[in-house]
């Protein structure tokens, strides 16, 4: 079917060019969007014509209904859809015949005319001129059933965006949220900065990195798992309020909440601590939810999440003691391991840090509304400052929403001797087989030796946050082009043939 369809369209293109018509012209003067047309002329009554108002519009043809010497068709741009009406006694018989023969669903056209409302009350453009702007060689998914196979959606996101207004709105929300974040931070005196994607040493998170090779120096390098250590170098250098929005890469599994490539924001503020960063996190996310959703109580997968501040703050030690009956500071490893075994949790690595991490995972699922889990043990927080009241703990928090970690923040460790010792402990864990433990970063220790002011640091996983504001069940639904298992092109074409409802 696809082969025959493309051949037919290619023949049409050849026919157009033989008539002196270029099916892929260079530009068109589009004056209004679909939304602007609706907003400007929605006051018209059914059957009312406003011939004195001239407008131009361009978009993709999504449907056509031919009626003899006339046709109604719907066009779509990135703000929505608008109906248009063309007839022979307006554009001329030759152009009408050309429209019937060569303007097809999926093509882009530009129109000029005036607004009116049909007898049924639908705002419509009365076409006086039209220009073919781009011929589509492939058929669109059938309107009502759309795309059946989610893998097609993820591999060919452009298809979903073409046929689904909901998909356009989902990603518009995502992109608007990023804009809101920038406006929020810029208005508070933060500067957006850039740090390297290629790292000599991984750091800033516990994760398995992607390894690449730099030919010019004949050395292995790593795609960053987090920008943290470079951002703190900027704080050491003299910047005081900075943030970076960008991609991180972790060579780990894919799930509904994990992607090997993901977007995060990290924020650092000199002379602040983790209490200040908690306040900032709450204010920032409240602003994002309010401006993208219009309310602080949103529905996510059938459950309500209430973002109304103030958010609950719970000490990790107290939380795990209440829920599981274990004391992560006092109980020996054997007690923690036994509790995990009671829940059927299997561990490849059984050091204390992993035991505590897995215990935390058991109970975070029940936290639906935003909750700060605070004051983590030193053993699982190698970059956080020791707690001012209990040196076994750190001044760290994680923000949990709907059972998922959304943010992680510290009073940043700025004691170079303490940091060096913790890197040594992490290096020992790597030697024992923990590939996610931090590498030794002697240059970062050297930078700390020049002095870093008291600093609050914060990282937010933006994709997970965007899942909530778009009510998306999986992280791949909010990443425009997510990583999927590759297929041969021929297999994808076969999948295309069978992937649509007819």
From Swiss-Prot:
Subcellular location, record wording: Cytoplasm
EC id: 6.1.1.6
Protein's UniProt name: Lysine--tRNA ligase
Cellular component annotations (GO), alphabetically ordered: cytosol
Membership in a protein family: Belongs to the class-II aminoacyl-tRNA synthetase family.
Catalysis performed (reactions): tRNA(Lys) + L-lysine + ATP = L-lysyl-tRNA(Lys) + AMP + diphosphate
Keywords carried by this UniProt record: Aminoacyl-tRNA synthetase, ATP-binding, Cytoplasm, Ligase, Magnesium, Metal-binding, Nucleotide-binding, Protein biosynthesis
Any one GO molecular function term: tRNA binding
A GO biological-process term: lysyl-tRNA aminoacylation
HAMAP family xrefs: Lys_tRNA_synth_class2
Phylogenetic classification of the source organism: Bacteria, Thermotogati, Thermotogota, Thermotogae, Thermotogales
Residues that coordinate or bind Mg(2+) 1: 398, 405
Cofactor annotation remark: Binds 3 Mg(2+) ions per subunit.
Main location group: cytoplasm
CDD domains registered for this protein in UniProt: LysRS_core (cd00775), LysRS_N (cd04322)
Keyword NAD found: no
Source species: Thermotoga petrophila (strain ATCC BAA-488 / DSM 13995 / JCM 10881 / RKU-1)
InterPro entries found in the cross-reference section: Aa-tRNA-synt_II (IPR004364), aa-tRNA-synth_II (IPR006195), aa-tRNA-synth_II/BPL/LPL (IPR045864), Lys-tRNA-ligase_II (IPR002313), Lys-tRNA-ligase_II_bac/euk (IPR034762), Lys-tRNA-ligase_II_N (IPR044136), Lys-tRNA-synth_II_C (IPR018149), NA-bd_OB-fold (IPR012340)
Domain of life from the UniProt record: Bacteria
Positions bound to Mg(2+) 2: 405
Assembly and oligomerization: Homodimer.
Cofactor(s) required, per the database record: Mg(2+)
